[in-house]
Amino acid sequence: MRAKWRKKRTRRLKRKRRKVRARSK
């Protein structure tokens, strides 16, 4: 389920990559 959510929001992740990385952990 997480992998699919990342692929669907892959474009937004690229913009907030720093915040996303901290949230992922």
Curated annotation (Swiss-Prot):
Keywords, alphabetical: Cytoplasm, Ribonucleoprotein, Ribosomal protein
Source taxon at top rank: Eukaryota
One Gene Ontology term from the biological process aspect of the record: cytoplasmic translation
Assembly: Component of the small ribosomal subunit (SSU). Mature yeast ribosomes consist of a small (40S) and a large (60S) subunit. The 40S small subunit contains 1 molecule of ribosomal RNA (18S rRNA) and 33 different proteins (encoded by 57 genes). The large 60S subunit contains 3 rRNA molecules (25S, 5.8S and 5S rRNA) and 46 different proteins (encoded by 81 genes).
The keyword Nucleotide-binding is assigned to this record: no
Example of a GO MF term: structural constituent of ribosome
Span list, region Disordered: 1-25
Cell compartment(s), UniProt: Cytoplasm
Family: Belongs to the eukaryotic ribosomal protein eS32 family.
Keyword Cytoplasm: yes
Protein name: Small ribosomal subunit protein eS32A
Additional note from the record: Present with 11900 molecules/cell in log phase SD medium. There are 2 genes for this protein in yeast.
Function: Component of the ribosome, a large ribonucleoprotein complex responsible for the synthesis of proteins in the cell. The small ribosomal subunit (SSU) binds messenger RNAs (mRNAs) and translates the encoded message by selecting cognate aminoacyl-transfer RNA (tRNA) molecules. The large subunit (LSU) contains the ribosomal catalytic site termed the peptidyl transferase center (PTC), which catalyzes the formation of peptide bonds, thereby polymerizing the amino acids delivered by tRNAs into a polypeptide chain.
Primary site of residence: cytoplasm
Alphabetical list of InterPro entries matching this protein: Ribosomal_eS32
Gene Ontology terms: cellular component: cytosol; cytosolic large ribosomal subunit
